[in-house]
UniProtKB/Swiss-Prot annotation:
Swiss-Prot/TrEMBL keywords: Antibiotic, Antimicrobial, Defensin, Disulfide bond, Secreted, Signal
Annotated localization: Secreted
Name of the encoding gene: DEFB123
Pfam families: Defensin_beta_2 (PF13841)
InterPro entries, per database record: Beta-defensin, Beta_defensin_dom
Family: Belongs to the beta-defensin family.
Cellular component GO terms held in the UniProt record: extracellular region
Entry function: Has antibacterial activity.
Name of the protein in its database record: Beta-defensin 123
A single GO BP: defense response to Gram-negative bacterium
Disulfide bonds listed in the record: C25-C52, C32-C46, C36-C53
Main location: secreted
The species this protein was found in: Pongo pygmaeus
Signal peptide span: 1-20
Length: 67
């Protein structure tokens, strides 16, 4: 009985401590966050009003129009 109670307690704590994951954006290359890390840049905004943080290598390159 004590083992069952201990197991349930541990499972409850683990479910509360582990994050459910962050929402993905920009073709699954970015993550919706309140703040971006130093190696990431904001390119668009997510549906939940958070910033879509994307590493620069996954952002599209700007092309100049040719006339």
């Amino acid at each position: 009985m004590k083992l069952l109670l201990l197991t349930l307690t541990v499972l409850l704590l683990l479910s509360q401590l582990t994050p459910g994951g962050t929402q993905r954006c920009w073709n699954l290359y970015g993550k919706c966050r309140h703040r971006c890390s130093k190696k990431e840049r904001v390119y668009v905004y997510c549906v939940n009003n958070k910033m879509c943080c994307v590493k620069p290598k996954y952002q599209p390159k700007e092309r100049w129009w040719r006339f």
